Amino acid sequence: MAEVANNEQQAPQFNIQRIYTKDVSFETPNSPAVFQKEWNPEVKLDLDTRSTKLADDIFEVVLSVTVTAKNGDETAFLCEVQQAGIFHIGGLTEPQLAHSLGAYCPNILFPYARESVASMVSRGTFPQLNLAPVNFDALFAQYVQQRAAAAQPTEEANA
């Protein structure tokens, strides 16, 4: 019986407890002049994630999405969304947990953030903006490689 209980405790667990918008901002610093010009924007997307342990096996993950649209030299709009979620994640190894917090959870949050961005841009009366899907698994793998490369010279110096 104790063996069964140990197996149950070690079984991977993943549950979404809540998904919510933590912060939003939409700015049109050069309005109304921006509406009088030919629309040929350059759109820049910045992403960031962070996670916080709230309790045993309970984590908040925040995906920050910043979209900046420039029309020529002027900023047409700046849209910022912090989409968050509270997740129950247990029974994972440290690398599995890091991947869940850095890639899997942001994959869940991104469609909500994308919808918020599209809605704010539309309400700002700009042409529709649909953000392309993001491969958070690839971004996380790149982050892990960069950390490993940054740690390598330190290890060589200590040898």
Swiss-Prot record:
Single GO molecular function: unfolded protein binding
Top-level taxon of the source organism: Bacteria
Keywords, in A-Z order: Chaperone, Cytoplasm, Protein transport, Translocation, Transport
GO cellular component terms, A-Z: cytoplasm
InterPro entries linked to this entry: SecB, SecB-like_sf
Entry's family note: Belongs to the SecB family.
Coarse class of the protein's main subcellular location: cytoplasm
Keyword Electron transport: no
HAMAP family per record: SecB
Organism: Shewanella amazonensis (strain ATCC BAA-1098 / SB2B)
Stored SUPFAM superfamilies: SecB-like
Subunit structure: Homotetramer, a dimer of dimers. One homotetramer interacts with 1 SecA dimer.
A Pfam family recorded for this sequence: SecB
Protein name: Protein-export protein SecB
Any GO BP: protein tetramerization
Keyword Ribonucleoprotein attached: no
Function: One of the proteins required for the normal export of preproteins out of the cell cytoplasm. It is a molecular chaperone that binds to a subset of precursor proteins, maintaining them in a translocation-competent state. It also specifically binds to its receptor SecA.
Subcellular location: Cytoplasm
Name of the gene: secB
